[in-house]
Amino acid sequence: MVRVAIAGAAGRMGRNLIKAVNGSQFAVLAAASERPESSLIGVDVGEMAGLGKSGILIVDDLAKVTDDFDVIIDFTLPISTLKNIELCQEHNKAIVIGTTGFSEPGKEIIDQASKEIPVVMAPNYSVGVNLVFKLLEKAAKVMGDYCDIEIVEAHHRYKVDAPSGTAIGMGEAIAGAMGNKLEDVAVYAREGITGERSKDEIGFATIRAGDIVGEHTAMFADIGERVEITHKATDRMTFANGAVRASHWLHKKEPGFYTMHDVLNLDQI
């Protein structure tokens, strides 16, 4: 049984993570944190999440309760996640990272930390999305050189980064399968007279509207036919359950940088 700490416990994902841990037979909720200025500091996390009294009080810094947990699950903001990574290094804890929008220096910090502690990082913890990543690799190897490739993603109005980490992950899977780096072929915006589309680019389009949980489509368009691979999420519990699954898998692993491909053993497919 892995003892889990939830960073950003009062957020949309934080509350779902609490529910996912509560419903898991492999994990137990051991700690929860919120930003220092939150009015929920000192509140019982179970009561906050509508699950009844848990005996776990929300703290403003997980450093205060490091003896209580084995793994942090962090779906917050890059600046907060990087602080928790430092905490994990200091106290030999594992971390599951669902935060997106890291800068290149931030990614380098995570990579260096993974040499000391076990880290799972994924743009999306849905089992279905990670299967899609694998399907995209296969599709790109068969069709990529002959098609125009576009990725369209849609999320709720409150999402603060674009394109989504999942969309970027899709682009990386496709580009990598074709022997390219995404940064060399990605086109994130088109406006005005753009000229003819180049053959090797991967285009991205972003929608932010309403309460869309998450929808992603990768399009392989040739003359006369088009293949689309789509994933639609209707409940954030999909992501939360996957992250809890990852925390159980990560517990007692050797230091290293892992992804959901490792958690789900997708490389064997």
From Swiss-Prot:
GO terms for molecular function: 4-hydroxy-tetrahydrodipicolinate reductase; NAD binding; NADP binding; oxidoreductase activity, acting on CH or CH2 groups, NAD or NADP as acceptor. Its EC number is 1.17.1.8. The lineage of its organism: Bacteria, Pseudomonadati, Pseudomonadota, Gammaproteobacteria, Vibrionales. GO terms for cellular component: cytosol. NADP(+) binds at R35. The keyword Cytoplasm applies. It comes from Aliivibrio fischeri (strain ATCC 700601 / ES114) (Vibrio fischeri). It catalyses: (S)-2,3,4,5-tetrahydrodipicolinate + NAD(+) + H2O = (2S,4S)-4-hydroxy-2,3,4,5-tetrahydrodipicolinate + NADH + H(+); (S)-2,3,4,5-tetrahydrodipicolinate + NADP(+) + H2O = (2S,4S)-4-hydroxy-2,3,4,5-tetrahydrodipicolinate + NADPH + H(+). The gene is dapB. Its main location: cytoplasm. Belongs to the DapB family. It comes from the Bacteria. Pathway: Amino-acid biosynthesis; L-lysine biosynthesis via DAP pathway; (S)-tetrahydrodipicolinate from L-aspartate: step 4/4. NAD(+) binds at G8, A9, A10, G11, R12, M13, E34, G98, T99, T100, A122, P123, N124, Y125. It is found in: Cytoplasm. Pfam families: DapB_C (PF05173), DapB_N (PF01113). Keywords: Amino-acid biosynthesis, Cytoplasm, Diaminopimelate biosynthesis, Lysine biosynthesis, NAD, NADP, Oxidoreductase. This is 4-hydroxy-tetrahydrodipicolinate reductase. The active site is at H155 (proton donor/acceptor), K159 (proton donor). One of its GO terms (biological process) is lysine biosynthetic process via diaminopimelate. Catalyzes the conversion of 4-hydroxy-tetrahydrodipicolinate (HTPA) to tetrahydrodipicolinate.
